[in-house]
Amino acid sequence: MKKFLSVVLMLTLSVAMYAQKDVTKFLGIPVDGTKSAMIQKLKAKGFTYNSVTDMLEGEFNGSQVQISVVTNRNKVYRIFIADKYTCDESDIKIRFNNLCHQFENNAKYIGDENQTISDDEDISYEMLVNKKRYQAVYFQKLDDKMVDKYINAQLLTKYTAEQLADTSQVMQDKVSSDKLAYGWDYIKNNKSKTVWFMINSELGSYRILMYYDNDYNKSDGDEL
C-alpha cells in the first residue's frame, strides 16, 4: 500500500511540474494570468495605470513607454510596449540597432545575429514605397530550474530513490541517457518564449513597438 501511494505521489508531482509551463516573462513577471492581476503587478513595478486609455505608463529600459495588457479568453497572452514619444528617422534607426545589441548581449536571450539596420538604409522610402517591415525577434532561454525539476520528476516515475543513488556505471549511464531524453522532451513540448519589436511609422515620425508573447494563451483558431 505504501509503495502504491508513493507511486501515485510521484506521478502527481510529475504532472504538476509539467503543468507549470515555462512562459515568457516581462520584468520577471510571467506573461500569464488575469489582466487585473497583471496590471497590479506592473503597478507594483512603478508603472501608473491610465483608466482612460486602459494602458500603463512609465519608464522601461531608459525610455518613456505605454504598456497594454492583451488577453485571450481572459488570460494574458501579450504585453505590448510602445514608445510614448515618436522620433525622426535617424534616431529610430539608432534606437532599433541599440535594442538589437542589447538583446544580443543579454545572456537570457538567443536569436539570429545582426538583425540591425545598415547605416545607408533609407527607412522612410522602404516603408512607404516597398512596404518593408523592420523587426527583430529574440527568444528567452528556457528556465534551467524548471527543466531540472521536470527531469527529476520524470526520473522518479521510472526509478526508485535507491536506484537513482546507485553509483554503478551501468545505472549512471541509464540515468544520464534518460535525463537527455527528458530534457529534449521538455524542449519539444514548450513553446517559444518570444520577444520581438518593430518600427512603426506615423506620418514621417517613428516609434518602437515591442511585444512579449505567451504563445500558450494565444488564440489557436479553435473557436472558428
Describe every region a protein language model picked out.
Residues F4-M17:
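Sec-dependent N-terminal signal peptides
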Residues L42-A82:
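N-terminal, post-signal-peptide region of Sec/Tat-exported proteins
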Residues Q20-Y49, Y85-L224:
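Non-cytosolic coordination micro-motifs
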Residues L9, G58, Y125-L128:
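Short acidic-hydrophobic surface loop/beta-edge motif
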